[in-house]
UniProtKB/Swiss-Prot annotation:
One of its GO terms (molecular function) is 1,4-alpha-oligoglucan phosphorylase activity. It comes from Acidovorax sp. (strain JS42). This is Putative thymidine phosphorylase 1. It catalyses: thymidine + phosphate = 2-deoxy-alpha-D-ribose 1-phosphate + thymine. HAMAP family: Thymid_phosp_2. Its EC number is 2.4.2.4. GO terms for biological process: pyrimidine nucleobase metabolic process; pyrimidine nucleoside metabolic process.
Amino acid sequence: MSDHAMNEQRDHDTRLRAWRTGIDTYQEPIVYMRSDCVVCRSEGFTTQTRVLLTAGTRSAVATLNVVEGNWLAPGVAGLSEAAWHALDPAADAWINVSYAPTLDSLSHVRAKVYGHRLDAGAFNAVIGDVAAGRYSDLYLAAFVTACAGDRLDLSETVALTRAMVAVGHRLDWGRETVVDKHCVGGLPGNRTTLLVVPIVAACGLTMPKTSSRAITSPAGTADTMEVLAPVNLDIAAMRRTVERTGGCIVWGGSVRLSPADDVLIRVERPLDLDSEGQLVASVLSKKAAAGSTHVLIDLPVGPTAKVRSTEAAQSLGRRLVEVGRAIGLQVTLRITDGLQPVGRGVGPALEARDVLAVLRGQADAPDDLRQRALRLAGDILELGGAAPNGSGLQLAAEVLADGRAWAKFQAICEAQGGLREVPVTPYRQVITAAVAGRVAAIDNRVLARAAKLAGAPKAPAAGVDVHARIGDPVQAGQPLFTLHAQTAGELDYAGHFVDTRPPIFQISEEA
C-alpha cells in the first residue's frame, strides 16, 4: 500500500461522528468513546488519555472517558458542552481524534511538586499551555497545589505574574494615569467597587474595573454588578463604555485579559485554595492587563476574614507592592476592619440593593458600606492626582451627596447595556437570638457558607440579610439575620446548616 493510501486509511480510521451529549463538565473538554470503538483500539486510547480533537479548522485538547454498553452508537464520539463549544461542529460532522502533543511543561510542574524553584522560562511554558487549554483539570490541580502555601518566593511570583500577563490582552488607554482597586476578599457584603468606580469616574479619573465572579464566596463583584447591568462585555464594548463614561465594571473573564487566571480559578474554587503567591499573581496580572497604572488594594483583617491578622496583611501587602513595582504598577494599601460583614446584604441581589440605597442617598442605606467606600474612593482620588493629599475623602463625600456618583453609575449601567431591577426571593427564614445580650462576634466564613447554601451566587436573589452588628444589644427572639432562597429545598438546606452549627452570632449575655 502506498504512503498516500496508508494516510487516507489512517485518517478514515481516526474519524468519528460528533454527537453533543449535553453533559456539563464545567470548562474542561471531555470526549466519550465506546470501549469497543475501532479508534480506541487502533490508537491504544484508554480512559484519561489526552486526545486532540479536530473539526475543520478548529481543534481542542480533551480528556477521554471510555463508555461501556450502548449509550453511544458505534462510530460516534460524544462531546461534553465544553468540547462541543470549542469545536463548534455541524450536526453529525466528522471529527478526527489523535493523541494530543506531549506537554514538555509538565516537567516543570513535577519539579515544583518536589519543591524546586522555577525560573521565568518554566512559568512561561506552563502558563502558555494552561491558557491554550492543553492542561486537564488533573494537571491544573497539580500545578495549583504545588504553588500553594508559601511555595512561591518573590522572584517566582513576579515570573508567574508576568507569564499570566503575557498570554492575555493588554489594554492601552492612552492616558498617563489609569486607576484601579482590588479587595482581597473574605468579607461578606463588601461591595464597595460599585460605589468607588462612579465616584472616581465622576471626578474625571479613568477607572476601567474588571472584576471576578465568586470563587469561594456567595458573591463576586461581577455577580453583584450583573444584577444591575450586563457584565459580559468584550474588549470593544468595554472600551466604548470607558471612553463614554470614564469607567466600567465588567467581568474579567469576558474580556480575557488574563485567560490563564480564568482557567486556574476553575480548580482553585473546588479545592478552596487561594495562596499568597497565586493571589498576588492573579490580582496584579489582571490589573496590568487592564492598563492600570495606580492600584489601591483593600486588605480587610479579622479572625474570620481571609486575612486573619495585621501581620499577615502587612506581609501580603509587601508582596503586592514589590511585585507591582516589578511589573510597572504603583500599588497602595489600605488595611481595613474585617470583623463583620459590610452592609446588610450577602448575595448578589441583596448587595446590589445596598449599593443602590447608598447611591440614591436613602435614609436606610447602610452607613458602614457608605463610609468604607468613601475612604477607598478618597484614597484613589489622591493616588490618581484628582485631589490633594488629605482632601480625597471630602471630595468623594461631596460627589456622592450631590448625586454626581448616582448619575455616573446610571450612565455606566446604560453604556454596558441598561440598568436592571433587583430581583427578590419567594422563600425566607428569619434566624433569631436565643438569648438577650450584646453581639460580641460574627463568623464571616460560616455566614458566607449559609448564603451559599441558600443558593448564592447561582441564584442571584439568594443569600443572607444581616440585621444586627457587633456591639448591638439584642433581646431573645430578636432577628439576627434572614435567609433568602429561590426554592424551598435550598431554604431548608441552609436552615438545617445554621441549626446544626455553633451560633454564627456570638451573644454575650449581660448581667
